[in-house]
Amino acid sequence: MKRVNQSYAVVVLCLLISISAFAQKSASLPRSTPEQQGISSADLLAFIEAADKDVDTMNSFVLVRHGHVVAEGWWAPYDRDTPHVLYSLSKSFTSTAVGLAIAEGKLSLDDQVIKFFPDETPADPSVNLRAMRVRDLLRMNTGNQLEAPIRVDDPSKQTDTWVKTFLKHSVPFKPGTHFLYNSPATYMLSAIVQKVTGMTVLDYLRPRLFEPLGFKDPVWISSPQGITAGAYGLSVRTEEIARFGELYLHKGMWNGKQLIPAAWVEQATSIQTSNGSAPTSDWDQGYGYQFWRSRHNSFRGDGAFGQYCMVIPELDAVVAITSGVRNMQQVMNLVWDKLLPAMKPGRLPENPAARRQLEARLAALKVKFPTGAATSSLSSSVSGKWFEFADNERGIKAVSFDFNSAQPTLIVRTGAGETRVAIGRETWTSSRGQFSNGLERALSVPANPLVAATGAWSSENTFTVKLVLAETPYYSTLNFKFDGDRLVFDAEHNVAFGPTKLPQLIGQVRATE
């Protein structure tokens, strides 16, 4: 191990000497027609049509073949320039930081976990806790039966640090013998990297990974102790996900520079532990160091509600997808069923007509609008009225609508103040601001979210708003039913870590202000 670490250190030292100049080089992936890279435009169109029809909801898609982007699309209001939260796909980036720290000789796979935290380790650690190593954190074999109860939803209710909470949590199994998908274990990896480097994982990866790959201002949330969350909370753009996949596809090599030791890439993406036996499940193919093994001899990082970086070495391909889905296997099945058969070994004849069809379809992608009319006979009579609600857990005190202006507007009043949400008609209108729809406390939702809204009268007395948090997988469908002096407000999310349907609110009209 010592000899391997020394070899890694030499690689990293050479990298850091040249990194400053290299980081200035454009990292954008080249573009190509699908046919030049062995894929039919017609087959790609079939994939996009199926994704748009059957998946609710795709947010973005980038396909890279032979190092070239051959197709890319964003479902409006999502766009290429807005970062998207990755959830557990963040884990693969934390793994990369661990690999680089090992390469620099700052830690090893066999280091005891508790050795890094003498002040937060229980006075009499159990045999299994003492036996836990860095490699056990990486391969989700910590010996825990349940995840440590870290309060990511409300850190103020947790008195111990996240590290201390993990270390005092029960370890009933011998580390290395029991697979448990374990986000607090990834947080511990982040904490260890910060201990040995003096930098957060985010700052540590900036010159070593993010800048060389051309990532623009990646954002990563932290614990109350100022440690990068590690397991989740990284936000980047879809092409940046694809570049990360390309880096791993090419064993850590990028534009002629070895950013990550090839030996680490091999270890991280190989099976380090078995995690199931279902042949058709992409969650039962084995687990590496914060990477999943997948069918078709491939591997991936993935995150909640359908964030994917799929790497398919045998086809020299990377698929980057962001989405907001409940069934993540459905999206992977679509890739296996539609994209894999489309990838041929050699170039195909150009098909300009099919390519134009594909490009037009990609340019027109959008999250589906609510169906209904642009106006109602009630529009003028309810416009400007305030509907007040009894105290509720969502913190909404009152709402009002402006239907008389050219731009319909929803005004929401909470204890924090008043927010105006511009609503498009068969288009998306975007703005930033607080909007209490029950998602603010959900993991990784920005404090000042980018909100895109569109609306329609789904019936004569019901106005339906679809509200997308465009840096996340989330959208909410809000139904406002006007019934005389009453307003019945129903809301449902596409996905959530808890209930998707929120408690109904009943509002009562008061005098116009």
Question: Model segments located where?
Answer:
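Active-site SXXK
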Residues: L45, G67, H84-D110, L137, ...
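Peripheral terminal and inter-domain segments
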Residues: P352-E513
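Active-site helix/loop module of the DD-peptidase/beta-lactamase fold
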Residues: V85, E104-N144, K168, M199-V236
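Active-site Gly/Thr loop motif
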Residues: D217, V265-V319
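Active-site-proximal alpha-helical segments within enzyme catalytic domains
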Residues: A185-I192, Y232-M253, Q307-G324, W336
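A short, well-structured edge-of-sheet supersecondary motif
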Residues: I48-D79, D316-V319
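Bacterial N-terminal signal peptides
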Residues: A9-S20
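Structured C-terminal helix/loop/strand segments within mature extracytoplasmic catalytic/sensor domains
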Residues: G303-P370
